[in-house]
From Swiss-Prot:
Homology family: Belongs to the glutaminase family.
Name under which the protein is recorded: Glutaminase
Matching InterPro entries: Beta-lactam/transpept-like, Glutaminase
Lineage of the species this protein comes from: Bacteria, Pseudomonadati, Pseudomonadota, Alphaproteobacteria, Hyphomicrobiales
Molecular-function annotations in GO: glutaminase activity
PANTHER family xrefs: GLUTAMINASE
Keywords assigned: Hydrolase
Enzyme Commission designation: 3.5.1.2
Gene3D superfamilies found in the cross-reference section: DD-peptidase/beta-lactamase superfamily
Amino acid sequence: MADLQAVLDSIHAELSPRLGEGKVADYIPELAKVDPNQFGMAIATVDGNIHSVGHADVPFSIQSISKVFMLTLALGKVGESLWNRVGREPSGTAFNSIVQLEREEGIPRNPFVNAGAIAVSDVVLSGHAPREAIGELLRFVRYVADDESITIDDKVARSETQTGFRNFALANFMRAYGNIDHPVEHVLGVYFHQCAVSMSCQQLAKAGLYLAARGTNPITGHSVVSPKRARRINALMLTCGHYDGSGDFAYHVGLPGKSGVGGGILAVAPGIGSIAVWSPGLNKVGNSQLGAVALEMLAARTGWSVFGD
C-alpha cells in the first residue's frame, strides 16, 4: 500500500493555493457562516490505521452524508420492502427537484435525493416519537464511529427548519400520494436533525469503515450489516451519491461516495478503507469542489478506483 500520509500531505500541499474555491451553501443560514478556507481529509483503513491532514479534526455539518446512515437503519427495520417506497436509480435532476417526484407519482428516484431521504426518515420514524428516532440515528452514528462525543448541531437544525420550504413541499407532495405515513412536521423534524449531525473527517472516516469491510467495523469487530447489504449500499453510493453529478464523480474518482452541502464527502474503497474529505465550497450541483478534486487525486495515486488502476 502507498504511504498514505505522504499521499495526503502531497494532496493538501497541491490544493492549498485553491482553498476557498466554490460557494458555501448560503440557503441554510448557519452554513453560510462557515469559513470556506478550510480543508480536511482523513483515511481510516481496515487494518485500523487513521491518516489525516489539514482541518481533519474540525467538526462540520454532514448534511446529506447522514442519508447513508439512515438508509442503513431503514434497511435494518424493513429490509427490501423499502424499495416499494423509494427507487434505486440516479435522478439526473437537482437534489430537491419536485418535477421528477410529480412525474413518478410520489415515489422518489433514490434514497439520496431529498425526497427519498425524507421517505427513509419516515420509515425510521415508524413506532417512535421524533425525538426517539433522532436519538436512534445519533446512537448508530456514535456506534459505527466508536465515538460518543458526536453531537447534533441544534442551530443548524433550527436554521434548516426555518428555511426548508422546498423540503416541506416535497414531504407534503409524497404525503398526498400516500408515501409518507407520519405527520410531515414529525418526519421533517427527524430529517432536519439528521442533516445537522456534526462530525470531523476523522470521525466520519471511521464511521464509514463498515462499508469498506463487508459490513463489519474492523476496529471494534461490531457487525453492522451483512456483506450483501454493505455491497448494495456501496452500489447506490456509486450510482446516486452525488445527485446529478454522480456520473461525473464515478468517472473521475471511481469510488462509492456520498456528498453533503456542508462540504463533506464520504468515500469507500472496498476492502481497503473509508475516506472523508471536507472543503465547504460547493460546485454548481452542490458537491464539494475541492473535496471531489482531492478524491480524484487520491484515487489516481493509490489505484483505489473500483474500476482498477
